[in-house]
Amino acid sequence: MLIRWKSKDKSASSNQSVGGSSSSSSKKKRKGREGEEDWQNEAKSGRLPSNEQGGDERRRAMRRDDPRRHTLGGDMLVYGSQHPHAHQMAPQQQRAMDLEMSTRAQKNKKNQPMRGYAPVNQGPLFDDDPGIMSEVETASTGFRRGGKQRSSLPVVRTPSKTLERPLGLVFLQYRSETKRALLPNEITSIDTVRALFVRSFPRQLTMSYLEGPNVKIYIHDASKDMFYELEDVRSHLREIRDRSVLRLFESTEVAAPPQILPGGPGIPQPLPQAQANWDQDQSYFSEPEFDSDYKHQHIHKSKIGKQPAPYYVGSSQTLPRGMYSSERNKVSMDGYTSSPERSSRGNYEEPYYSQYGTRGAVVAPIIDEEQSDGTMTEDQYALYGIKVGPGPNRLTHRGNQIYDPTRPEDLHRIRVEHMERQLANLTGLVQKALVNQNPQIAPLAVPTLDPNYLVVPSQMQANGSGDELYIREKAPKLGKNSCQKSVSFEKSVSFSDDIQGIPKSHNPLHAAETKPTKPAIKSSTLPRTSSQERDRLKPPPPPKPIVLAQTAHPNYRADIALAPEVYNHLRGLQKKAKDLRMEVRTLRRLSQAQAVAVREDIKGTFMRIRATLLASSGSFWDHQGDQDATRISREEELYKQEVIRLEKDLSDLEGSVENLRGEVINRRTRVNMTAVEDMALVLSRASKTVAELKLKFPSLSNGLRCILSNEMEKVVREEKFLKEEPDRLESALRRCKKLTGTLVTLKRLASVQEQRLPPNEPTISEETPRSADISAPDKPIPTPRMGSFALSGGLAPENALDALLDELKTFSKPIAQQQQQQQQQQQQQQQQHQHQQLYEIRPEDSASDESAQAAVQSTVTTQISQARLYTEASVNVQQATTGSMVIAVASGTVSAQAQAQRGVLTHQQSQSQAQLMVHTNMGSLRRLHSYPSESDGELPGPPPTGPRASETSSSTSLANGGSSSKPPVPERNAELITKVGHKRIPPPPPPRTSSRSPLASPTSPNVPPNQAAAATVNLIPNSNSNASANANANANSNATGNKGIVGETTSVVSGDTSSGDNSSGNESGNDHVQRQVALEMRHQELLKKQKMLQEQYQRLQQMSKLPSVDVASSSSSSAQDIASGSNTLRKLGSETNIQQKIAALSLACETSGAAAAAAAAAAAAATNGGVVASDATSGAIGGGGGAGAAGAAGASAAAAHSNSNSNSNLNLNLNSQHQTATTTTKQLYETEIL
């Protein structure tokens, strides 16, 4: 197009812009040449000579006069102004036509390139005609609007003109071909998409063909990787974006050859004026259809105005139809008219324009949509005679051509494909409007299309305004073709078949001759042949109706004068037609969707049927063995029947033979040969039967054996299943329990690690023996901390593990088995605990960290053992021997020396703990902080301040053998933890009770402090033997320097949840009193339960055999023993329940196990200062100093002694422990050994 414009500008840029008629004629010639150049050199279209640009601007000025300057109509007006007739057009009429037809003109312009851009006027129109532009031009320049300056514009159009949509690529797939096309600025209708296809596949597709019912456009949905039909709905059209893939599906090949489509390249033979008129008609008619599109396309229109809307290839644009037709004929010859619509449009427009010269005449008859249908357009032309050439004869001839048998067939075929009924209605409406409003329009008889008609300049000029108006109108009609052409360029370009219809009216002439028409765009791109050539190529257009033929162009101009109203009316008709078409498309899509749904339903049903069949077939195969068995059984039956018959025959034969023999012998009768032969036959049959049966029997026997073997296998499998399944279930249950225990242990360890508090907690003494002070081997094994639980009963499961444990209780095995399992688990856990102790003891950590590590270790031990240890001693006695640190959790195992001094502290601690326990009410999980006493000869870390100090002092006093058992270190509250900077207090390595297990501590609210105190005191007597413990305790107490104060701090450490002030040391006294009361109450309860506990002594002995109870000579052995002892008591049940029960057991053992404690103390003394801790729950855990063996022996002896005595107080051995805590442990085992 740029080339065309350039050539036009070069030839007569001023003439093109200013002079309409003279320049138009030259432009026609140029456009004929340029059309060829354009399609060949569309890329060059970007260059518009300045002259052409000036001409375009002039055209723009004309458009400015017209309401649609920017539209194709504007260009057409400018073009018309170049033509005398165009100038003759009243400015109002032109404006109105511009308003209405500019969109149509754009569309028509799209169609025009197909028709050919021969007319000189069409030269500017050509520039304006987007159809004239090649894809390259439109791609590179956006598309020329005026064809003048637009060609020079950059590819990206200005936002106002391009609708602010950048160009994008769209991939068009037609059959096996895939092409790229530029997206239009805006896609307002499906016609734009069709135009894209027509433009990309000019030789294969035409707008009319695409509009057929058997051709559908599908868009690819990348997310679903599927194509779905593209509906002519904004929501669907918006989905066409850059890189979208559009596919054209057709049930049949392109039905009509391009010649059928109006605007076929061969068709554009009409005179340029006639073409111009036809353009006007087309744009006029097409405009309603494309109105919405063109409104969106106005930018394109403006562009087209500047450049003959390159997308509107149809010559129906402002270019003179004669020129278009001639060029289009060339195009058709070139084969660009292969797209039926484009070629047909161009042909119709050109022939009619050439014939009619005036666009006015053409305007009325042409409806782009109908024409785009091809048949409708031609019929419309024929009916309206709108494309009346300069001479009415030509119009008539053209009408005749429209009605020519060849043309009608193609047109009707296309019409049927493209909503024939709707188009027919539109045609009727348009005809009425044109005939009524424009009575002057008479069918111009144009028996033949002569190049003269195309060339007729007078008519062109006379109808110049009409042509311009018509072109504007036609541009909208071209919209379809133009849209086809410009589809890649703009949405705004609407694909109005009616616009094409004008060229289609030409098409009746051309379509028959040239079936292949290039897509509108390409046809525009193609050099336009002269209208004469087109006429030569095309059969003479069918004569138009007499009315149309009669109407002269001037008359048509008169109609054009009425054009504004007519255009509006036609526009409304076109819009209605478009709405109807949209509805039809919607219905079609709905039907398609329904068909898809039905297909899916059928497919689903098929799949279900198939699945059923497969299942049945599978069952068939499953029952194949049964079928074999049935077959064999049938064979067996047949075999038996044969045997029966055989035996019968033999018996009969034998009888007969014997009778005959007897008769012969006795009676000496003659033997009848026949009888003998009969018998011989029977015998032969019998012998054969026997042979056959003998042959059959092996296979039968094999089959029977197989069946029997299979049955035997089934029986064996069933028996094996019945026999092994219970064991399998039991093993699975055991595994579940084991895993549960492991998870519980890991949970405790994690909780301990997470709950450590910083050493400098305000409520807890910041200074505690540092891990550095205590060597890892010497560090006492943390006694298992009691799970939190209340004396009254276990708390609700704390977490999913507890719930799981409760559920597993139902499957718990007898206590003996449980104990064995627990022992094994305890041993494993002991090893883990030892490793964890080493791992968790960090010398760099503060005392709190150290205690936390110890607590972690204790947590690793079973909760039951922890509960016992804690409840018996109600204090964790930490004694570190030089060789090893053994935590002796014996309420009474404290050196006698430290008893007197620390008895008060322990009482205070117990009281404070009792208070704390009562306040906590098993609230947040609390852990009593006890600090490990340092190894003998080692002084404890600096005296702890605050509750931890008291805690430490209490532990040391107990280690020293204080008169009273060391009360458990006060528990930690969640509140206390929160106060401590949201860091969890590190659990002390010595046994501690969590807040959940108030029973564990002698100060638990349910137990009177007296009981607790008594229990603690009862367990103390043998603590004198623990020299090392005493030394450690003394050292610790000395280091602290405040023995009395230590107890207070310890009590404070546990903290009172209600008060929240656990750091006050004054509370220790009250705590001690409460603790004693709780202990006293517990003592009474435990005395009652002692007998019950003894009953379980036998069961507990198995657990008591564990070495953990004995005092180990080495710290490691003692640690293992302690861990094992704790493990024996350790259950996988919920920590709370186990701890509660263990606490009760431990208290009972503490009260009743004084003798056992004494024995344990003696054993400890034998161990050279080893500390014997007799814990009701966990037994006496002693860390021996020098001679661990002696300590162990003593401990065992003490355990045996305590066992002999009814006192079931826990000795070093677990036997005494379990004996004293029999009832509670039994319950614990039954409920929580899991």
UniProtKB/Swiss-Prot annotation:
GO terms for cellular component: cytoplasm. Residues 1-88, 107-129, 330-350, 498-548, 754-793, 815-852, 928-1011, 1028-1070 are annotated as: Disordered. Transmembrane segments: none annotated. Keywords: Coiled coil. It comes from the Eukaryota. It holds the Pfam family AIP3. Residues 412-436, 565-594, 630-666, 1077-1105 form a coiled coil. Residues 12-25, 817-837, 952-965, 993-1004, 1028-1039, 1046-1068 have a biased composition (Low complexity). This is Coiled-coil domain-containing protein CG32809. InterPro entries: AIP3-like_C (IPR022782), SRCIN1 (IPR051825). It comes from Drosophila melanogaster. Residues 1-11, 55-69 have a biased composition (Basic and acidic residues).
